[in-house]
Curated annotation (Swiss-Prot):
SUPFAM superfamilies: WD40 repeat-like
Organism for this UniProt entry: Homo sapiens
The entry's keywords: Cell projection, Ciliopathy, Cilium, Cytoplasm, Cytoskeleton, Disease variant, Repeat, WD repeat
Skewed-composition ranges (Low complexity): 764-777
Subcellular location: Cytoplasm; Cytoplasm, Cytoskeleton, Cilium basal body; Cytoplasm, Cytoskeleton, Cilium axoneme
Xref: SMART domains: WD40 (SM00320)
GO cellular component: 9+0 non-motile cilium; centrosome; ciliary basal body; ciliary tip; cilium; cytoplasm; intraciliary transport particle B
Protein name per its UniProtKB record: Intraflagellar transport protein 80 homolog
Biological function: Component of the intraflagellar transport (IFT) complex B, which is essential for the development and maintenance of motile and sensory cilia.
The UniProt record lists the keyword Transmembrane helix: no
The UniProt record lists the keyword Repeat: yes
One of the GO biological process terms: protein stabilization
Tissue expr: Isoform IFT80-L is widely expressed.
Length: 777
């Protein structure tokens, strides 16, 4: 990725340009010390003077009023705030009319910023004051006051906090009066510029110590640049939070959100005092010290999938290369490319007006359809369809270009959605809520309606990243997520009215990815790279989960690595320095998944015998129990030395009825309640009581015996035997009440139990014989 710079031969301003801002992706306003506000039209390359300010007004900063979302195409900003050296800020219309001028600070007003909703304005000045104003310019409060000038300010993503500079310190102050203030030393020189991104919640700072730094919202350092030759005078996040730009003297740098540099350009600009990204995130404008406005387009982005490499060579052209045969295809578009995604044998490209869908089998005939709003900020792909975040809505389309659905939920903010907070599978869409980050909304892909009974998924901690598995049946769909404590959890998306258990898979997990062809999960856990070959094991037999993992040292990936993709048996990881590392894992677990999904159990056993690895046998054991194939489970458990489980499986095989077998398989997986329900529905009340006795669940055993008026003496007898074994006296009031005047006769009880077992056997054989009679012609 690099920047394509365009700079006019002669500057349009006579003095330094202090600030720039985009109205649409093709229109920019610039303000200069020559008192002019100039409009730039990039389509026609024309510049027009909007207004000439009075000679005593020197503009310092300006910010467009946030656009209203949800109207067709880009709704243009209609007014902006301009801060100036005379201590005032001015509310100015798009046509250049000064609507209002407000005395704000003693000395220059160094920065002014609207919040994301456009309901409040923050200004900072040389007098060290931070003030909050209403939309109409009425003073609401003085948020803070200090003895040094405040050079830069930024709103937090929720518009509830303000970040500002204080010499070498950065301060985050909430708008609530008594809330805790966060302050830390950020640079060795005066901090000149800050920016806070609403999508990734990361902070940028630039200072006179010639460094730029990246921080999280708690003030923890994520990246610290090498010192440059000159002070860093400007920094700005791209709207989607994936990139940021850095400006200095004769220097413009494009960086990844983790800090490493994609490209460095040395235009003849003087110091770049202000950087603004276009709404679609494809181009940058810089306010230059020599009167120029520098424009830079982001080009040469790369996308890779299997043997295909796609490169954005120009604003309207892409090159596709097949690395197997070196075949090259050129793709040309009518409009500027905004976003693209390559996955599942399809390339999806969005321009400012249309969406193109290419198949990797045929690059010549794409499916083309018009976009609703033309401001795509995210593309996600699954095997059968893809998702677009376009303007204020989410749209799901098939690869044939057919519209499928558009999920919605109350308070949905599409401007802050990214690949970490939205996940897509063939049947489900998952979106983490921004208002309450502990909640995940789940939708049916085919209808866009809430999944199942409409309940959202709720966790006890804030969720950072979510990912749906990609294969298997809808009823088995799982979602994995990382929470604020860096715990990796997994749960089922189908709730069936009951609260599904959220199970912790690992701790200190930084990044995760599901495989695209089978439900294998990988993640970076502290200093280890881990692959969960069969994450469903946690629902089947948690004891053998450690045996189903692959682990290796991850220290070679340095600090803060990120998993980019997990395609086939290859995992791609991006290190903190920007380099890509590819890891290959064994292909056998994927083959095992394939055999099991096709119920080829003999082939699965044969594969495990061929590979001779404990992880494979452990995966097969869990898969067999999950699919109720106890013969295969017995072989697999024997292979990993779990003899007690082999014996239990043998005892299940000898049970008389299929209901009893089913109940004991559920018990084997720890599903006690479900096992009891199966037995009670089949009328096997004694067996339901007996499993509670075996588990020492005395309260429930007595409750069932009393409810069904049977085997009360059996429960009391086993309870008495249990207490005698441990030399204890009965203290439970219910047991004391039912034991009054009841003589325990073990002979009678054993006869009753024998009768129950005989009855169950007869019932089972009669149902089987009736079935066989029914089958005869």
């Amino acid at each position: 990725m690099r920047l394509k710079i365009s700079l006019l031969k002669e500057p349009k301003h006579q003095e330094l340009v202090s600030c720039v801002g985009w109205t649409t992706a093709e229109e920019l306003y610039s303000c200069s010390d020559d008192h002019q506000i100039v409009k730039w039209n990039l389509l026609t390359s024309e510049t027009t003077q909007i207004v000439k300010l009075p000679d005593d007004i020197y503009p310092i900063d300006f910010h467009w009023f946030p656009k209203s979302l949800g109207v067709k195409k880009q709704t243009q900003a209609e007014s902006f705030v301009l801060t100036s050296s005379d201590g005032k800020f001015h509310l100015i219309s798009k046509l250049g009319r000064v609507e209002k001028s407000v005395e704000a600070h003693c000395g220059a007003v160094l920065a002014g910023r609207w919040n994301y909703e456009g309901t409040a304005l923050v200004t900072v000045g040389e007098d060290g004051q931070i003030k909050i104003w209403s939309k109409t310019g009425m003073l609401r409060s003085t948020l803070a006051q200090q003895g040094t000038p405040v050079y830069s300010v930024a709103w937090g993503p929720d518009s509830e906090k303000v970040l500002y500079t204080a010499g070498k310190q950065l301060i985050i102050k909430p708008l609530q009066p008594n809330a805790k203030v966060l302050q830390w030393k950020a640079h060795d020189g005066i901090i000149l510029k800050v920016d806070w991104n609403s999508v990734n919640d990361l902070i940028l700072s630039a200072g006179e110590d010639c460094k730029y730094k990246v921080w999280d919202s708690y003030g923890r350092p994520l990246y610290n640049s090498q010192p440059h030759e000159h002070p860093i005078t400007s920094v700005a996040w791209a709207p989607d939070g994936e990139l940021f730009a850095v400006g200095s003297f004769h220097t413009l740098r494009l960086c990844d959100k983790t800090g490493w540099s994609y490209a460095l350009e040395k235009p003849n600009t003087g110091s770049i005092f202000n950087i603004a990204w276009s709404i679609d995130g494809t181009q940058i404008a810089g306010a230059c010290g020599n009167g120029h406005v520098v424009f830079a387009h982001v080009v040469e982005q790369h996308w890779e999938w299997k043997n295909f490499q796609v490169t954005l060579t120009k604003r309207r052209a892409m090159q596709v290369r097949n690395v197997l045969n070196d075949a090259v295809d050129l793709l040309e578009f009518r409009d500027r490319v905004i976003k693209a995604s390559l996955n599942y044998a399809h390339l999806v490209v969005s321009t400012s007006l249309q969406c193109y869908v290419f198949s990797t089998k045929n690059w010549n005939t794409p499916i083309i359809f018009d976009l609703k709003e033309g401001t795509v900020s995210l593309i996600l792909q699954a095997e059968r369809h893809f998702l677009l975040v376009d303007g204020s809505s989410i749209y799901l389309y098939s690869y044939e270009g057919r519209f499928i659905s558009s999920p919605k939920f109350p308070g949905m903010r599409t401007d802050i959605l990214n690949a970490q907070t939205v996940s897509l599978s063939n049947d489900t869409i998952a979106i983490r809520d921004k208002a309450d980050e502990k909640i995940i909304f789940l939708f049916e892909a085919s209808t866009g309606k809430p999944l199942g009974d409409g309940k959202f998924l709720s966790h006890k901690n804030e969720i950072l990243e979510i990912a749906l598995d990609q294969k298997g049946l809808t009823n088995d769909r799982k979602i994995a997520f990382i929470d604020k404590n860096r715990d990796l959890c997994i749960t089922s998306v189908k709730r069936f009215g009951k609260e599904e258990q959220i199970i912790k898979l690992g701790t200190m997990v930084h990044t995760l990815a599901w495989n695209d062809t089978c439900n294998i999960l990988c993640g970076l856990q502290d200093t280890r790279f881990i692959v969960w070959y069969y994450p469903n094991t946690v629902y089947v037999d948690r004891d053998i989960l450690p045996k189903t993992l692959y682990e290796r040292d991850a220290s070679e990936f340095s600090k803060n690595p990120h998993i980019v993709s997990f395609v086939g048996n290859q995992v791609t990881i991006r290190r903190a320095d920007g380099s890509l590392v590819h890891i290959s894992i064994t292909p056998y677990p994927a083959i095992l998944h394939e055999y099991v999904s096709s119920s080829k159990w003999e082939d699965a056993v044969r594969l495990c015998r061929f590979v001779k690895e404990q992880t494979m046998w452990a995966c097969l054991a869990a898969m067999a129990v999950a699919n109720r194939d106890m013969t295969t489970a017995e072989i697999a458990y024997a292979a990993i030395g779990e003899i007690d489980k082999v014996q239990y499986i043998n005892s299940i095989k000898n049970l008389p009825s299929k209901e009893s077998k089913m109940a004991h398989i559920l018990l084997f997986s720890g599903n006690i309640q479900e096992a009891e329900i199966v037995l009670l529905q089949a009328g096997l009340v004694y067996q339901a009581i007996q499993i509670n006795i075996n588990l020492y669940n005395w309260e429930r055993a007595l409750e069932l015996a009393v409810k069904y008026k049977t085997h009360v003496d059996t429960v009391l007898a086993y309870r008495q035997k249990f207490l005698e074994t441990f030399g204890k006296q009965e203290t439970n009031k219910r047991y004391l009440h039912y034991a009054e005047g009841l003589q325990i006769d073990w002979e009678k009880i054993k006869a009753k139990i024998e009768m129950e077992i005989t009855k169950e056997r007869e019932q089972s054989s009669s149902s089987q014989s009736s079935k066989s009679i029914g089958l005869k012609p």
